[in-house]
Amino acid sequence: VGVPVYFQSVLSDGTAEGRREAFFLIGSFLALWIIAYGAVQAFAPRLLGAKGQPATETTRKAILWAGLLVPVPFLLAGAAWLAEGPSPLLTATLILGLLAFGFVFAVNSSVHSYLILAYAGSEKAAEDVGFYYAANALGRFIGTLLSGLLYQWGGLLYALIGSAVMLTACWLITLTLPDRRSDTRLGVLDT
């Protein structure tokens, strides 16, 4: 929530026309970002060389890629703190940071989608996957709500710090993923 609101504040001059132009610029950027995210997510299995690898190796990759996410919002929060307010340099830094974050997050998401299937029991895989996506939706809702509240309380800096803290918690939880099923070789990522 915080980043698009920040972009609106720096791209709009406050007039109706300025708000409209900013709206379409931000919307177009985010649409292209989502399309690129999907392309990276689709390509991630090849990028990771995931074909036929055991679930334990994929678990190690989940830990690695979740860990790679953590510094991005911390670095962006540092940039926001140093900028002490909106600036062209901060805006450019945020755009580059969003691109880097989107790439790493898309790979991470692909790995997690595989792992939910690898860890699901075959007799209740649909139920396990359903719970995963329900938890995912709830997490997105809480993240969106928290991001908006943090932006209201402390601007972009607080929203980015909140993101960094939540990603750190995610990474710490990922460290506890079991290495069971070390012999599992699902064809899910065989693309």
Segments (PLM) and residue ranges:
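Loop-to-transmembrane helix entry/capping segments in MFS-fold secondary transporters
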Residues: 23, 120-132
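Short amphipathic helix-loop junctions that connect adjacent transmembrane helices
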Residues: 2-25
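Transmembrane alpha-helical cores of Major Facilitator Superfamily
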Residues: 31, 35, 130-138
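Transmembrane alpha-helices of Major Facilitator/SLC transporters
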Residues: 26-51, 72
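Multi-pass alpha-helical transporter architecture, strongest
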Residues: 77-80, 162-191
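Intracellular juxtamembrane helix-capping segments at the cytosolic ends
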Residues: 107-120
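A membrane-interface helix-boundary motif in multi-pass transporters
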Residues: 19-20, 88-89, 149-168
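C-terminal transmembrane helical hairpin of 12-TM major facilitator-type secondary transporters
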Residues: 59-109
